[in-house]
């Protein structure tokens, strides 16, 4: 559905965060007098009222009955379509779409494809991978947009002039299904990995996997680039797409620190500013994507040396009294915490884990701790007691210290004390969201920096957003 097709319909916006505001502005550009209703909370309602838009109404209760009064509801990504009120309204005929679907419909060519649209998703690593892809494309002289879930809603860049040659688009699991629903098809879709995540939004692990894979199953990209090492992806059949693989010995893959293409060594990643083997494997994915676009990936690989790492992602803040502080606040799954720990093997590490409890399974994390644990683990947050109870029977035999904290400040105090005069690495990689304590993972990362004695402004915005 294109924006012009909304004219004359009963249309509502559900959510007034950045995506909701971007949708409002996009609609007003094309439909300046279209009556609209915004569903938002009371605080946001005051912001909406300040717009003084006579064709804009506000409702603060998004009940099934209220939603069902509209033909089209443009919802923000964080609002699950599986919510009871959304399901009930949909059953009564309301159509729910998101800004991602509107953007793709606006850009689709007559054959359905969106030229230059490269969609990146995965449970972890998608922001860094998308930014690295944009970095390499720009290094090759191509005007490229870095947009989507990474921090710039697609509808904020609806029609930039001149248009970019490529769109590097990060999509969360909340957005991946929108591509297929738009009827449009991206030029390339890259899926990095799949682990259980966002189960409170999706309702189950099976639904999460289904919704995530909708990017390639329903979105039908011209090229689907998949991780051959991921069991969810290795079994996919995508007859309407050209399927390519990375992390496969016949394609782009990593051996030690060296990127190979088949049997040919291409690039030594030892000096690339990307900590962790998982990031170097994702560099393989980026190079495979660049090659799939018809560009010289081998020649572009050295451009990765000038990539600027993203904040809150294994971000080294500095050292104080022999303790190095590393901010990995973006970590919201146990798998992400494990990947972070792997970057500091053989080092003295105090790991801070815990946060909002989304019901994720920490058994695999515990199994890893039984074999290869850091020196100290400090649990915190709503799911801290659950993680602590799981690890307590293992601590003595596996040889790690285990501590329970009331909050982040207390956790850092316990970690510093445990590391002692010998120092080491104090790693914030919570494996859980920040909800209930912080507005988002960025606020959590800034608080961590402040408590460590660093300027919270060091947790800066993601560089390179928008069209460059």
UniProtKB/Swiss-Prot annotation:
Gene3D superfamilies: Mur ligase, C-terminal domain, Mur-like, catalytic domain, NAD(P)-binding Rossmann-like Domain
Localisation per UniProt entry: Cytoplasm
Sites where the protein binds ATP: 122-128
Entry's Gene Ontology BP terms: cell division; cell wall organization; peptidoglycan biosynthetic process; regulation of cell shape
Alphabetic keyword roster: ATP-binding, Cell cycle, Cell division, Cell shape, Cell wall biogenesis/degradation, Cytoplasm, Ligase, Nucleotide-binding, Peptidoglycan synthesis
GO molecular function, one term: ATP binding
Pfam families referenced in this protein's UniProt entry, alphabetically: Mur_ligase_C, Mur_ligase_M
Catalytic activity, EC: 6.3.2.53
Pathway where this protein functions: Cell wall biogenesis; peptidoglycan biosynthesis
GO cellular component term, pick one: cytoplasm
Function of the molecule: Cell wall formation. Catalyzes the addition of L-glutamate to the nucleotide precursor UDP-N-acetylmuramoyl-L-alanine.
NCBIfam families: murD
Family: Belongs to the MurCDEF family. MurD2 subfamily.
Protein name, UniProt field: UDP-N-acetylmuramoyl-L-alanine--L-glutamate ligase
């Amino acid at each position: 559905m294109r924006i012009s097709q909304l004219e004359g319909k009963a249309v509502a916006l559900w959510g007034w965060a950045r995506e909701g505001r971007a949708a409002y502005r996009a609609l007003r550009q094309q439909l300046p007098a279209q009556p609209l209703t915004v569903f938002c909370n009371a605080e946001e309602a005051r912001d909406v009222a300040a717009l003084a838009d006579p064709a804009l109404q506000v409702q603060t209760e998004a009940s099934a009955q209220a939603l069902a009064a509209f033909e089209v509801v443009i919802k923000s990504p964080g609002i699950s379509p599986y919510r009871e009120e959304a399901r009930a309204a949909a059953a009564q005929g309301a159509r729910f779409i998101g800004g991602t679907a509107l953007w793709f419909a606006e850009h689709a060519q007559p054959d359905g494809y969106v030229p230059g649209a490269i969609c990146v998703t995965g449970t972890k690593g998608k922001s860094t991978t998308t930014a690295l892809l944009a970095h390499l494309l720009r290094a090759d002289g191509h005007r490229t947009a870095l947009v989507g879930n990474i921090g710039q809603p697609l509808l904020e860049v609806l029609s930039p002039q001149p248009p970019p040659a490529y769109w590097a688009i990060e999509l969360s699991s909340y957005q991946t299904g929108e591509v297929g629903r738009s009827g449009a098809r991206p030029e390339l879709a890259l899926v990095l990995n799949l682990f259980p995540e966002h189960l409170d939004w999706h309702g189950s692990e099976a639904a999460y996997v289904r919704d995530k894979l909708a990017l390639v199953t329903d979105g039908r990209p011209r090229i689907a680039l998949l991780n051959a090492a991921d069991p969810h992806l290795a079994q996919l059949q995508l007859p309407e797409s050209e399927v390519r693989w990375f992390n496969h010995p016949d394609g782009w893959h990593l051996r030690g620190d060296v990127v190979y293409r088949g049997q040919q060594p291409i690039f030594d990643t030892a000096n690339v500013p990307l900590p962790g083997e998982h990031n170097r494997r994702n560099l393989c994915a980026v190079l495979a994507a660049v090659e799939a676009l018809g560009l010289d990936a081998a020649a572009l690989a050295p451009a990765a040396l000038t990539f600027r790492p993203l904040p809150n992602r294994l971000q080294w803040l500095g050292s104080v009294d022999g303790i190095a502080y590393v901010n990995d606040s973006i970590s919201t799954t146990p798998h992400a915490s494990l990947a972070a720990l792997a970057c500091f093997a053989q080092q003295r590490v105090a790991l801070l884990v815990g946060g909002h409890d989304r019901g994720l399974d920490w058994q695999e994390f515990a199994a890893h701790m039984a074999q290869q644990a850091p020196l100290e683990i400090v649990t915190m947050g709503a799911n801290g007691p659950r993680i602590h109870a799981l690890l307590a029977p293992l601590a003595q035999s596996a040889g790690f210290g285990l501590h329970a904290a009331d909050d982040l400040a207390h956790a850092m105090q316990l970690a510093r004390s445990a590391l002692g005069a010998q120092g080491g690495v104090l790693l914030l990689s919570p494996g859980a969201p920040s909800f209930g304590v912080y507005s988002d993972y960025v606020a959590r990362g800034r608080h961590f920096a402040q408590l460590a004695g660093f300027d919270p402004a060091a947790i800066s915005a993601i560089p390179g957003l928008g069209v460059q």
